[in-house]
Amino acid sequence: MTLLQNADLMTAIVTPFDDEENIDYGRLEYLTNYLIEHGSNGFVIGGTTGETPELTHDEKIELYQHFGEIVNGRVPVIAGTGSNNTKETIAFTNEVAQINGIDYALVVVPPYNKPNQRGMVAHFTAVADSVDLPIIIYNIPGRTGVKMAQETVVELSHHQNIAAVKQCTSLEELEYIVEHRDPDFAVFTGEDAQALTARVLGANGVISVASHTYVDQMRQMYDSLYRGDYQTAGKLQRWLTPRMAALFMFPSPSPVKAVLNAQGFNVGSCRLPILPLNEEEKRKLETALSLPTNSLTAKNLPLNLGE
């Protein structure tokens, strides 16, 4: 857990595309540097927010190579390598393990074929035993259709090559895992609205989507907590929570990309089957985020969207 000890606010970063839907590495570098400078201290590349289902194998390898060079060891980098095929997961993870600057592999609970708990243990054990990169469990039942039980996460936490979990379930389950995990096992919530509470409960932090657009406020929230200024930390979380929810009111990452484009990061559109927001959806998102009318179309938002 050494590299993850100081990583409390990690961003599940988008994949920028140009007008021809090629990956735009210049925009990726610009966004990455901005986020690091403003308090994000770790990244997931090639995750759900990075549109990994829409990337080819070769694109992922090239993306991870470029991203390792961009970050250059400044913060931990976690690359998505999971699938619902154990042998393919092992092969791809070992391929990614050869890339400089990739510190961990994010391995999702197998979607679609929906293994039971024994199958999950067998899958993650086989992967962890066979790869040259520490892995992080990605437990996101809302997308996979099946949930890894809290007891199963705890069981797997004792494997020497399973370093952490990104947990997208209830706070009660997160609390159980924090209480019963192996001491060297890191726990991150993948639910932005749980960011403050998870840290108070003893989790290591959050792997966030909202930190793209609210990195200053989230950094201030955690720093206020560490100073013992609970009133400010709580106020910030309450201010953030409805905005965090709004970033998922349409299929992700189209909302966060719309805001980033309006801020001048120019991360482009989404690949099919995810569509960019239409004008009606932009108006609804502006209202939910308390943004000026037509600001997402005019692309005149400031970098800091705070009060």
Swiss-Prot record:
It is an enzyme of class 4 (lyase). Keywords: Amino-acid biosynthesis, Cytoplasm, Diaminopimelate biosynthesis, Lyase, Lysine biosynthesis, Schiff base. Pathway: Amino-acid biosynthesis; L-lysine biosynthesis via DAP pathway; (S)-tetrahydrodipicolinate from L-aspartate: step 3/4. Pfam families: DHDPS. InterPro entries: Aldolase_TIM (IPR013785), DapA (IPR005263), DapA-like (IPR002220), Schiff_base-form_aldolases_AS (IPR020625). PROSITE patterns: DHDPS_2. GO terms for molecular function: 4-hydroxy-tetrahydrodipicolinate synthase activity. One of its GO terms (biological process) is diaminopimelate biosynthetic process. It catalyses: L-aspartate 4-semialdehyde + pyruvate = (2S,4S)-4-hydroxy-2,3,4,5-tetrahydrodipicolinate + H2O + H(+). Its EC number is 4.3.3.7. It is found in: Cytoplasm. The keyword Amino-acid biosynthesis applies. The record marks T48, Y112 as: Part of a proton relay during catalysis. Pyruvate binds at T49, I207. Its main location: cytoplasm. Signal peptide: none annotated. The active site is at Y138, K166. GO terms for cellular component: cytosol. Catalyzes the condensation of (S)-aspartate-beta-semialdehyde [(S)-ASA] and pyruvate to 4-hydroxy-tetrahydrodipicolinate (HTPA). Homotetramer; dimer of dimers. HAMAP family: DapA. Belongs to the DapA family. PANTHER family: 4-HYDROXY-2-OXOGLUTARATE ALDOLASE, MITOCHONDRIAL (PTHR12128:SF66), DIHYDRODIPICOLINATE SYNTHASE (PTHR12128). This is 4-hydroxy-tetrahydrodipicolinate synthase. It comes from Limosilactobacillus reuteri (strain DSM 20016). The gene is dapA.
